[in-house]
């Protein structure tokens, strides 16, 4: 409400590190609160919040690799939504490491990067 954050669904290129790194990811959903990170090609620097939706056949190793990559880049919040198990894994950055919590699709989940935003998964059709 009244903030500068914007939501960008895939396809949307994110260059996680502002240096010469060639690491580019394409999260399912990126939330960016700093408009200075936006370019005509996508985003340069870590989004504030990334949501990935697990596709059947996706490797859990991919989730772990991205988890470490996103923590190193400074992504403040990372959610993995698994429609098959009906679980949401929420990782909230504390200093340089993620604090992890898990929820079901029957729960209301606080978005940690905002003071007053909750997502009620019971209300969503997934």
Where are these regions (language model features)?
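C-terminal interaction segment
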Residues: 2-73, 80-126
């Amino acid at each position: 409400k009244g903030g500068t954050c914007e939501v960008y669904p895939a396809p949307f290129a994110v260059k996680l590190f502002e240096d010469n790194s060639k690491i580019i990811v394409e999260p399912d959903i990126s939330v960016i609160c700093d408009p200075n990170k936006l370019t005509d090609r996508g985003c340069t620097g870590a989004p504030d919040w990334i949501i990935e939706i697990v596709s059947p056949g996706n490797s859990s190793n991919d989730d772990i690799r991205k988890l470490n990559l996103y923590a190193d880049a400074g992504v403040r919040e990372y959610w993995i939504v698994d429609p098959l198990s009906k679980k949401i894994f929420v990782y909230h950055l504390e200093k340089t490491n993620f604090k992890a919590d898990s929820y079901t699709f029957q729960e209301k989940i606080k978005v940690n990067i905002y003071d007053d935003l909750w997502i009620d998964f019971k209300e969503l059709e997934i």
